[in-house]
């Protein structure tokens, strides 16, 4: 990866400091569902795009009966990415009811053949995103 690509990633991710210590301006893009992306979703989407990841669907409903959405999904390879915000602020994903609901969702996804990658705040790194892209590419090649 060259320096231009890394700089692009840094500029597209407001939580990342650029080498000179400045922070890029935050950006907000509308999701296909009509709501705005969280800063964590923006960070992931920006990193994914900068690394030339394959197209993903956001807010993808994978279950035939339940209305559970994945934050991002690559349906052709049954690969999902779930962003787990609020780990340090007693967010929904870490409180009892939300945690149990997430367990039900992830278990149902597994039973349907989905691979779910869970990324918490601080885990959206070039290395982790490249690992997910590699997983998708390998599954595509195996078809």
PLM features per residue range, with description:
Residues 1-143:
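Nucleic-acid endo/exonuclease domains
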